[in-house]
């Protein structure tokens, strides 16, 4: 029985970020800090920091944490360059003025250049926040889940 409990806890630890990003799991037994510490025990020490940063940004974007997005990393090793400030400003302005079509096109400009795993975390987080702001929460969550799946593979 304890072996099954251990396997269940491990499966929950692995699935938690996806469930949280999808809006399924909001008040379970894990939070970002607990998940991060458990994740650090299971994998290479450099990877959890990047995963935690990306997950923190995604959850902030989906849950309305605009101030958290301002703290986005400027670069990451082996990844994409930070997004263009002019495109980010245009995206934020379009979302603030509830221009859905323009917001969607700017998100495509930011994220449409490759796979979601290649995008800069700030571009992804700002895109999700803008989609949520114009009422496209379901689409934002779907992009967040797909991004987490791509990054975990």
What are the residue ranges of the model-derived segments?
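Alpha-helical solenoid repeat scaffolds
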Residues: 1-153
């Amino acid at each position: 029985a304890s072996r099954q409990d251990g396997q269940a806890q491990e499966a929950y630890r692995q699935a938690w970020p996806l469930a949280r990003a999808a809006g399924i799991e909001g008040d379970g037994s894990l939070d970002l800090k607990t998940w991060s510490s458990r994740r650090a025990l299971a994998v290479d020490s450099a990877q959890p920091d990047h995963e935690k940063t990306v997950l923190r940004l995604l959850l902030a974007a989906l849950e309305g944490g605009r101030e958290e997005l301002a703290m986005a990393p400027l670069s990451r090793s082996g990844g994409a360059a930070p997004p263009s400030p002019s495109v980010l400003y245009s995206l934020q302005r379009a979302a603030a003025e509830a221009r859905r079509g323009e917001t969607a096109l700017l998100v495509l400009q930011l994220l449409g250049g490759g796979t979601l795993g290649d995008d800069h975390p700030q571009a992804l987080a700002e895109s999700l926040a803008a989609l949520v702001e114009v009422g496209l929460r379901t689409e934002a969550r779907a992009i967040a889940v797909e991004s987490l799946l791509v990054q975990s593979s």
